[in-house]
Amino acid sequence: MIGTLCRFALLTLLAVAPATWAASPEQVPTVHGLSLYGEPGLPAGFTSFPYVNPNAPKGGSLTRAVPVSFNSTNPFIITGSAAAGIDYLGQSYLYDSLMVSDPAEIFSAYGLLASGIRLDPQRRWMEFDLDPRARFHDGEPVTAEDVVFTFNLLVEKGAPFFRGYYADVTSVRAEGPLTVHFDFAENNSPELPLILGQLPVLPAHYWKDRDFSRPTLEIPVGSGPYRIERLDPGRQIVYRRDPDYWARDLPVNRGRFNIDRLIFDTYLDDSVALEAFRAGNIDLRAEMTASNWATGYQGPAMERGLIGQLVVATHNPAPLQAFVPNLRRAQFQDPRVRRAIGLAYDFEWQNRNLFYSQYRRTRGMFDGSEMEATGLPEGEELALLEPLRDQLPPEVFEEPLPIEEPSDLRERLRQALALLEEAGYRVENDRMVDAQGRSLSFEILLWDGRMQRMVLPYVRNLRRIGIDARVRVVDPSQYQVRISQHDYDMIIGSFAQSSSPGNEQREFWTSDYADRPQSRNTAGIRNPAIDQLVESLIRADSRESLDAHARALDRALRWNFYLVPQYHNPGARIAYWRKLAFPLPFPDYGLDLDAWWVDSQRASRVEAAQDDQQP
């Protein structure tokens, strides 16, 4: 599940003894939470998530920067750019979802709008009982009809993502005012109950007479912990904590959503955003630039202990960032060409000279986890790959991972030249050309000019072996249009991986998504073997089996050289003004900023110091 897909981690399946019949709802126990494998970690009647401060004070404000402007409050469609704070899956500031995850657990979730959950032992259906106290912001109750309406609305009029995400749901219906019933297709994904738990519930009475397919700047009716206080289109959105929020005292919310006002300001230039932070106009920021982290926060405020820096590691797979060649282009069809262009990437030089040695090289799809393929395949992983032997590169079975590459760039470039020669290319007048004399060339498309600092050394290495590589920078809106139309040779892509990969892998890697507009299969991969491995992974029925399936997929993708993996930070880098406080230790599988609060005494000192530094 993409992590960032939202703050919702993976949920699902209550472990129950196997059965050969579909139980009726009356025969299935009603539970407070679900776990993908085994029992959920927190018992019925738990009082709060274990990582929060249940007595955290309320009050204060938090200002954050966002790098893109917005023109809509509807994040559920592909048109428009939605404002920060309204997620399309899971609980957000504006909308509650049926369930919410505990980032201290890897595969569990607990009821939010749902006060009770029933799951058929054979996973043919599930039901949610809604909390009778649940209310939208206008006072209307949240009903089963709202859930049915939301599901159908997202599938029929929402982004194409939803149709694939909920493809294994065959029907949904209300069983009374507060119970909703979902029927599942046969051989559905084990994580499907979790996926449904992520469903945000929209008010049918508000949306039924509005055009859901179009962007809007109306302030919608929600049910979540905050209301939109103010909108300045493209520039700022302000949320105000709702003191009458119906779920404020539920165990899943206790100690969370502590800050009264949440302000998201748009800064299209990150250097301006950094200066705004240093001036005290932004309270917290995630730092993405190594040089900023090393030197950008130095100054009187840091010396006086008013600014803090955190590196927060999680147990999730490392985020995957990579150069993504577009396989829809002819020059990238040969895997030997793809391997050759990967050999020209010199991570070690970049890390030393550009990144203050802060990063680690990313090796594969699930780097740093039990799902990362290493050595040679064996056991269940080998059994999964063996039927596909004729469709996979022989190295999958014969060569261990990680792939060995010389540390010396010159030797890597010699290997790249040899691979290109095998693929039918030759060097002619310092140009790499094919048998027809056509130059091997491609353009790397960027939306942020600052990325050239990292990309240009790679381009220079490619040119050393005769490849005509170029960089083009376009504005973010043009970039999005070209991405949606697959109009690029190569981009830098990101693939957020969770500790429980599932349905989202279809959109990353499978043939069915290769030509869909807006799909995340940006590489344009069409490979029946990969398709089969993804479908098999989605239906893995145990943690051990999921790990084996993920390793098989990882191995097959890596030996096809579909991507040129770049690097990752060992943890999230967070800079903050010390008016903010947070509970320790952090949860293992996510950083929950909504468990932070404003310390009023610290805030007074920080604000006085910020006033002193104003001109």
Language model: regions and residue ranges:
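Aromatic- and charge-enriched surface segment that lines or borders ligand/interaction sites
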Residues: 52-57, 79-88, 116-160, 175, ...
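Ligand-site clamp/hinge motif
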Residues: 131, 214, 247-297, 339, ...
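Surface-exposed binding/hinge segments that line
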Residues: 129, 163-208, 223-232, 375-389
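N-terminal lobe/hinge region of extracytoplasmic solute-binding protein
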Residues: 24-122, 152, 219-221
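Aromatic-rich, solvent-exposed beta-strand/loop patch
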Residues: 111-115, 137, 142, 183-202, ...
